[in-house]
Amino acid sequence: MEYQEDVFVGYRYFETIPGAAASVCYPFGYGLSYTTFALSDVRGGMNGAGEIALSATVTNTGLCAGKYVLQAYVNPPKGRIAKPAAALVGFAKTRLLEPNESETLTVSFAPYAFATYDDEGAVRKSAYVLEKGAYGFRVGENVRETVNVDYRYELDDDAILEQLSPKCAPTLLHRRMLADGSYREIACAPETPREDWRKLEGIPDEGQYPLENPDQIPGCAWIPPIKPQLIEVAEGDLTLDEFMSLLSDEDMARLLGGQPNRGVANTFGFGNLPTYGVPNVMTADGPAGLRIKPECGVTTTAFPCATLLACTWNTEIVREIGAAGAREVHENGIGVWLTPAINIHRTPLCGRNFEYYSEDPLVAGEMAAAMVEGIQSEGVGASLKHFACNNKETNRKDCDSRLSERALREIYLKGFELCVKKAQPLTVMSSYNLVNGLWASQNRELLTDILRGEWGFKGMVTTDWYTHAPQYTEIAAGNDVKMGCGDPAHVLQMMREGRLKREDVVVSVRRLLEMILKLA
């Protein structure tokens, strides 16, 4: 699936491409109200933190009480790199304003919020840049109904904000869209020859390892506990290094696969090494409320779906919903809630759009961060998913998302980046699909170089359930646990053959145990 529209997704397309605007009935950010509002004293400038601060006084000019969302958009200068005509850089929402009541709102953001990733070297290859020129700003109630801010962020020379290196470069993407609606061929990286993993490892077409008893996921039989116990690490009597030094390769291989359900859970668990007191931490979906086994007869709350939550533009409400849902999750004996989902509304045809927040990565990232903060405030782990580019449902285990590095970073990874840096979810779930020719679950540039190296992610990565990539390639890439079950024997075989480093296994086990200790 080629993302030839590049960064021109959603309103970025309709506000930029000539002739496209007429197709829009409801512009991005549009909302209904029982009252009317007016903006006054609109200002802009730099604050003491080196951020751009845009402010406006909002007055309720109608007859009913209401709230107003102040949305801030950047209008970048034209340059060597094609840019959307408008992009959201921040938003704020008033309290409930009575008729004739006013409130002054301020939206602050760093210049990085509107930087461009240069994947072709027009300014500086593999860097976030700001081309020289004047960057204008507008504020208002949607992308169309805005007023100009009498402030420009002006640069006499190009600025390099962050120098990175090429990651996840496309190998089979034919062209990319430009700001005038035309297309240009894109230079692709040479395709790296890869072995046919399934044939090599004897993996069946459905991507799952054959089990001796197909009706039961392999687990651990209960064995009377012996010392040491993981709780001794939690209580400070043992270091994690000391505890892990006593685990055999067989113990570690078992820990890196999903574990059987218990209680009301139906999406399996993590851990489950009773000999060493490692609990079986249960997981459960999902993005619209806790989903458990229907035959249990336990009812749960159906919270509004992610798209509806994003329509509130209210991160505090989303944070409270995350906390409320997490309390319900905890009451049902679940340790990790498999939410939020944060993929982009690239097309209305994606079957999981109800789980996703927005076509805009800033909205998605801010909402997801609030949700994660709410969930984890109650001692429950959040799982940020699906990392990354899960934008179709049919055949999503084998679909190859082919896109430029720029589109990947500015659109499809940006929400994940915002959420990770702001909220540090305990887990991230990699997606089924391939990203530029490599399954996301075995993509080291994505899971290690970008997620951990660039963004500073501290948690554990799991696969989505029953991915097609061999488990040992996933572990080597930084994907710690294979769900819903792994294959310990296969992992051990790859270790013996030298195709999987023991140190990679140790690192993944450490991340798993650190996650469990944070839940204890």
Where are these regions (language model features)?
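Glycoside hydrolase catalytic-domain context in secreted enzymes
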Residues: 1-145, 164-520
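Extended, polar beta-sheet/loop recognition surfaces of beta-rich domains
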Residues: 144-165
